[in-house]
């Protein structure tokens, strides 16, 4: 491989390092896409890998299982990420064993998710009744279960550990020392970032989590960030070594999330019938866990503000809130229903449980707009899924949403969470069919730049580099010890 200086300062052999920027692994230009519309403008392309693929990976996901339904409890975008990545790693002949906490008595110890991917349930604490915030007290039991599972294997069974979220990173830190393999870590969310952008009345993340994240950042061989924004947070807020931070953008299942064939208006009507939504008028959908961080209340308040601004338009709009309570939202599971009643817009708000199978793409196609008003997102898979279905997104201009949505191309980014500002954006977009059609076309083009196949290709580069560097350190140590 030719030595060169990356445009953003990646350390390559024999080259001076720019410590102010991480690596961005950019996608190649999608077939038929406009180069000017590519979401990532920096990075480097690689030829054949100069290192072997890892044979087997231990994936750690303490607090949530990829088998759980996204949109309920603690299951969300991270579940989708782990599931989609594991499937495609198996297709690339890399075995994946996912370790997660057992949460029900009827769960088998091991589930084969697809050939080459196994989910192993680790007994650690009570099966039910523990919140994510209470799980640090069970990390010792979980770690013991992981180490015992590996102890019956032949030495060198795993080539690498990939931990997800800080709880798993703590387990991975110990396992990497015990097994003598590199640790790759993806944070998915960061306490310091969440605490800097708290919703009103939401609980701040505890100091113990901040300390735990700092420890994992210091110990991981590679840190995978979803976007350049998250990479910057790791470097600036957690003092991560930029040469160990790699940006690998998540993807979307373009076969599942795609525009309906045929006439769009007819397809929208059919999707609304499927979900028992009004066939006429406008539909604005929120999809996600019901918790202050995701800010579904901002959308409901915006609907009420729109009624003050344009009563006729507001009465022609239905807000759909799709998801289940999670996190601090569990403390007030009926809060949004009560809020809609207090604002006098109960007749304009519909609540749906998390959607599975073909019903989730149908919901995106049924909507005229999908709203993502979160206070923070490391990426925002919902925004990407909606755009892949050809539905423009109105999103808060925070975190990874600045990457997931291209402002005025695939949707609209709103500064802040003022319901009046959100009502203004909705009021401008909904009646303007021409502008929404333009954004719908841009949304499809933008989403085509993301795929899980590309994500896994880039992750394999990260894995290979981590394994190669680890083996070099071992070789150097052995040489020095002679």
Swiss-Prot record:
Database matches in InterPro entries: Glyco_trans_1, Glyco_trans_4-like_N, Mycothiol_biosynthesis_MshA
Residues annotated to bind 1D-myo-inositol 3-phosphate: 63, 74-79, 132, 165, 189, 209
UniProt GO molecular function: acetylglucosaminyltransferase activity; D-inositol-3-phosphate glycosyltransferase activity; magnesium ion binding
Residues binding UDP-N-acetyl-alpha-D-glucosamine, per UniProt: 69-70, 77, 289, 294, 355, 377, 385
Recorded catalytic activity of this chain's protein: 1D-myo-inositol 3-phosphate + UDP-N-acetyl-alpha-D-glucosamine = 1D-myo-inositol 2-acetamido-2-deoxy-alpha-D-glucopyranoside 3-phosphate + UDP + H(+)
Keywords: Glycosyltransferase, Magnesium, Metal-binding, Transferase
EC number(s) reported in the record: 2.4.1.250
Disulphide linkage map: none
Any Gene Ontology biological process: mycothiol biosynthetic process
SUPFAM superfamilies hit by this protein: UDP-Glycosyltransferase/glycogen phosphorylase (SSF53756)
Biological role: Catalyzes the transfer of a N-acetyl-glucosamine moiety to 1D-myo-inositol 3-phosphate to produce 1D-myo-inositol 2-acetamido-2-deoxy-glucopyranoside 3-phosphate in the mycothiol biosynthesis pathway.
HAMAP family assigned to the protein according to its UniProt record, in alphabetical order: MshA
Family: Belongs to the glycosyltransferase group 1 family. MshA subfamily.
Record-given protein name: D-inositol 3-phosphate glycosyltransferase
